[in-house]
Amino acid sequence: MLTSDLSNDLANPLPLAQALIRRPSVTPIDAGALDVMQAALEQLGFTCRRYPFGEVDNLYARRGTASPCFLFAGHTDVVPPGDDDAWRKPPFGAEAEDGVLWGRGAADMKGAIAAMVASVQRFLDTGEPKGSIAFLITGDEEGPAIHGTKAVLEALADEGETFDHCLVGEPTNPNVLGDTIKSGRRGSLNCTLTVTGRQGHVAYPERAENPIPALLDLLGRLLARKLDDGVPPFQPSNLEVTSVDVGNPTTNVIPAAATARFNIRFNIAHNGDALSDWIRSEVAKIDLDFDGRIEADIHVTGEAFLTPAGPFTTLLQDCVEAETGRRPALTTGGGTSDARFIQLYAPVAEFGLVGATMHQVDERVPVSDIETLTAIYTRILKGYFKDFPA
């Protein structure tokens, strides 16, 4: 049975989008958002399974067992709204006024999830698919992303579950609906460098071991390397230092330790292991003239990937163009998403709403964009099950 604030007319995406936004599902809190999704999908004939890991809950739903299987993927968790009083509309009020839907998650990405569900209802109204449709909805995308899509995919693989293509509903469009489809993403590596010395008075440097010169030397070596010139359609890889800290507000004390943090966004010319080895090799070249140590704490949060242009991406472009009049570009820029996990299991692309206000105060989207996105998703389902045989 559907929740009381959700219309039985699932072909209309707005009531479902509002019901989801009214759940304050700030990572890792679900607040009933997945219950709303499960109720809607069960009404459409999906078999639903929940996958709780740690503090996070996740939902996998499938309708049918035959191939090909088309997977919709997304997340119901949202970032905190910040100061509620700074919003023109309540962040979890889901008010629709003058053709605009307001609320945290409207753009990223509860509006797109509602469009996915509505598109399935509209598609099923025309007949049964020659294959299967599935949903993977996580509550851990905006957070560490450890207990979300990645963990569910691993569990599904252990159970023998497979799918053939995936569309993620991230807000890929920077300006207007139909701008861009994400056909790949850069990889991401985080590193914390720590040089440990010995604290002392600046007037007696012989009694101290200053870690700062060694840290600056190491950062200089890392920054001196041009990683690449870009690999189309990827932009050049970049290393950005994000902080340098010594925890020392004074001018007469040599600090005991110095720390720097940086991130590398890398294209398919690199992988996480090779970059990690390079960082460690540069660390090994630093010759400390005192009895200290240098540590590099490296975490690769995602590898670069690309879904090559082909029948799947062409289908997506054709359907977007048919509904918007714009031919979307296939791009790979921006941050990471859960597509970095999905690409290990099936070809994946991303297309959703306009992201201009995502994560901001007064997040909002035109209701007409949600309707158009529903029409695009419906057209994609029709084309997919017509042109992609088992």
UniProtKB/Swiss-Prot annotation:
<comment type="subunit">
    <text>Homodimer.</text>
</comment>
<dbReference type="GO" id="GO:0008270">
    <property type="term" value="F:zinc ion binding"/>
</dbReference>
<keyword id="KW-0862">Zinc</keyword>
<dbReference type="InterPro" id="IPR050072">
    <property type="entry name" value="Peptidase_M20A"/>
</dbReference>
<keyword id="KW-0378">Hydrolase</keyword>
<comment type="similarity">
    <text>Belongs to the peptidase M20A family. DapE subfamily.</text>
</comment>
<feature type="binding site">
    <location>
        <position position="108"/>
    </location>
    <ligand>
        <name>Zn(2+) 2</name>
    </ligand>
</feature>
<keyword id="KW-0170">Cobalt</keyword>
<keyword id="KW-0028">Amino-acid biosynthesis</keyword>
<comment type="pathway">
    <text>Amino-acid biosynthesis; L-lysine biosynthesis via DAP pathway; LL-2,6-diaminopimelate from (S)-tetrahydrodipicolinate (succinylase route): step 3/3.</text>
</comment>
<feature type="binding site">
    <location>
        <position position="108"/>
    </location>
    <ligand>
        <name>Zn(2+) 1</name>
    </ligand>
</feature>
<keyword id="KW-0479">Metal-binding</keyword>
<protein>
    <recommendedName>
        <fullName>Succinyl-diaminopimelate desuccinylase</fullName>
        <ecNumber>3.5.1.18</ecNumber>
    </recommendedName>
</protein>
<dbReference type="Pfam" id="PF07687">
    <property type="entry name" value="M20_dimer"/>
</dbReference>
<feature type="binding site">
    <location>
        <position position="170"/>
    </location>
    <ligand>
        <name>Zn(2+) 1</name>
    </ligand>
</feature>
<keyword id="KW-0457">Lysine biosynthesis</keyword>
<dbReference type="GO" id="GO:0019877">
    <property type="term" value="P:diaminopimelate biosynthetic process"/>
</dbReference>
<dbReference type="GO" id="GO:0008777">
    <property type="term" value="F:acetylornithine deacetylase activity"/>
</dbReference>
<dbReference type="GO" id="GO:0050897">
    <property type="term" value="F:cobalt ion binding"/>
</dbReference>
<dbReference type="Pfam" id="PF01546">
    <property type="entry name" value="Peptidase_M20"/>
</dbReference>
<dbReference type="InterPro" id="IPR002933">
    <property type="entry name" value="Peptidase_M20"/>
</dbReference>
<dbReference type="GO" id="GO:0006526">
    <property type="term" value="P:L-arginine biosynthetic process"/>
</dbReference>
<dbReference type="InterPro" id="IPR001261">
    <property type="entry name" value="ArgE/DapE_CS"/>
</dbReference>
<feature type="binding site">
    <location>
        <position position="359"/>
    </location>
    <ligand>
        <name>Zn(2+) 2</name>
    </ligand>
</feature>
<comment type="function">
    <text>Catalyzes the hydrolysis of N-succinyl-L,L-diaminopimelic acid (SDAP), forming succinate and LL-2,6-diaminopimelate (DAP), an intermediate involved in the bacterial biosynthesis of lysine and meso-diaminopimelic acid, an essential component of bacterial cell walls.</text>
</comment>
<keyword id="KW-0220">Diaminopimelate biosynthesis</keyword>
<dbReference type="InterPro" id="IPR036264">
    <property type="entry name" value="Bact_exopeptidase_dim_dom"/>
</dbReference>
<dbReference type="GO" id="GO:0009014">
    <property type="term" value="F:succinyl-diaminopimelate desuccinylase activity"/>
</dbReference>
<dbReference type="InterPro" id="IPR011650">
    <property type="entry name" value="Peptidase_M20_dimer"/>
</dbReference>
<dbReference type="GO" id="GO:0009089">
    <property type="term" value="P:lysine biosynthetic process via diaminopimelate"/>
</dbReference>
<feature type="active site" description="Proton acceptor">
    <location>
        <position position="141"/>
    </location>
</feature>
<feature type="binding site">
    <location>
        <position position="142"/>
    </location>
    <ligand>
        <name>Zn(2+) 2</name>
    </ligand>
</feature>
<feature type="active site">
    <location>
        <position position="77"/>
    </location>
</feature>
<feature type="binding site">
    <location>
        <position position="75"/>
    </location>
    <ligand>
        <name>Zn(2+) 1</name>
    </ligand>
</feature>
<dbReference type="InterPro" id="IPR005941">
    <property type="entry name" value="DapE_proteobac"/>
</dbReference>
